[in-house]
Amino acid sequence: TQPESSAASDVYKRQQPSLVISDISTLKTLEERDFLAGYGEVAKYGLLGDYEFFCWLEENAENIRNRDINALITAVAHSCKMKSAIVIADEKEQGERALLNLGHTFCHALEAATGYSERMLHGEGVAIGSVLAFDLSAKMGLTSNEDPTRIKKHFEDMGMMNSINNISGTLPNADKLVELMFQDKKVVDGKLNLILAKGIGKAFIARDVDPNLIKDVINNSLAI
C-alpha cells in the first residue's frame, strides 16, 4: 500500500533521469567473454530500430572488440539514447517498449535450459535469440534471408556465439525449448508474442506466432 503523505507520494512517482553517467573505463576491466556478452545488448539496438547504427557497429567491430575508447563511447552513448527514447515513449510497456525484448524470449528459454549457468551468459543468449528472431522473420517472408546471415557473420566477427549449437553440453530438443518459451511473460491468452523484424532496424511485435515455425528455426540452429 502506498503511504498517504505527499513526500512519500513523490517518491513513488515515475521520473525519468535527466542525466545518465557511464564510466566507460570500467569496460576495460571486464574479462573478454563478459565484455562481449554485454555487446549483445548493444547490437540489439541497431537490430531493433537503427539500421545505420548497425552498419556503424559492423564497420567498427575491430575497434569495439579492441575496446577503443572512442568507439566504446559512441556505442554506449547511442545505446543509452535509444533506450531512453523508447522507455520515455512507453513507460508502462504497453507498446513500443516491448521492442527492447528482441531476442529475449529465445534467450530466456535457453537460460532455463542451461540452468542459468556459465554455459551461456545473458548477453550471449540475446545474441543467439536475435539471430533466431531474424531467422524466423526470414522464414515467414518478413525479411530477406541475407539479414540473418549478415547478423550471424557480425557476431562471428566479434568472437561471439551466434547459434544454439555454440552452447556447450546437452540441450533439450526444439519441442522442449518452445515449451519453455511459452512460460515467458509475453504469452497472452496462451498465445506467444515475439519481437520479429521486417529488416534490420525494423522490429515489430508479432502476435500469436506459429509454434511449428519456431521449432523449425530452433532445429536449424541446433544442427548448424
Regions inferred by a protein language model and the residue ranges of each:
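Short beta-strand segments
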Residues: K13-R14, I21-S22, N101, A197
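Single conserved hydrophobic/aromatic residue that forms the stacking wall/gate
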Residues: T1-A8, Y12
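Core active-site phosphate/anionic-ligand binding loop and the adjoining beta-turn-alpha structural block
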Residues: Q16-I69, I73, A77
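Solvent-exposed alpha-helices and their adjacent loops that cap or buttress functional pockets
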Residues: D10-R14, E91-K92, V187-V188
